[in-house]
């Protein structure tokens, strides 16, 4: 099953997440189909905290992809800000 979820990057104690489309059987930080955005939970100042390609996310949802709980709330925030 295809899912849209977060893949963790960054350094220890300084997380940075990629929003990726992947097969649910793949590892959290493993192979993915497409990168559709990023989320920086510790963004400060003028740093961009969230960027999502909503068109591509809608495309994948139309094809039957499921969304993780956290990504669902991020999509909601991005739509509210747009």
Curated annotation (Swiss-Prot):
GO molecular function, one term: structural constituent of ribosome
Keywords: Ribonucleoprotein, Ribosomal protein
Residue ranges of the TM segments: none
Matches recorded under Pfam families: Ribosomal_S16
Domain of life of the native organism: Bacteria
GO biological process: translation
Keyword rRNA-binding: no
Cellular component annotations (GO), alphabetically ordered: cytoplasm; small ribosomal subunit
Keyword tRNA-binding carried by entry: no
InterPro entries: Ribosomal_bS16 (IPR000307), Ribosomal_bS16_CS (IPR020592), Ribosomal_bS16_dom_sf (IPR023803)
Similarity comment text for this entry: Belongs to the bacterial ribosomal protein bS16 family.
NCBIfam families in the record: S16
The protein's name: Small ribosomal subunit protein bS16
Gene: rpsP
């Amino acid at each position: 099953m295809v899912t849209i979820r977060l893949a963790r990057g960054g350094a220890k104690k300084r997380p940075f997440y990629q929003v990726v489309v992947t097969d649910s059987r793949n590892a959290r930080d493993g192979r993915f189909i497409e990168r559709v955005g990023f989320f920086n939970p510790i963004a400060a100042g003028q740093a961009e905290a969230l960027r999502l390609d909503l068109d591509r996310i809608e495309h994948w949802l139309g094809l039957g992809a499921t969304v993780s709980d956290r990504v669902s709330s991020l999509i909601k925030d991005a739509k509210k800000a747009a």
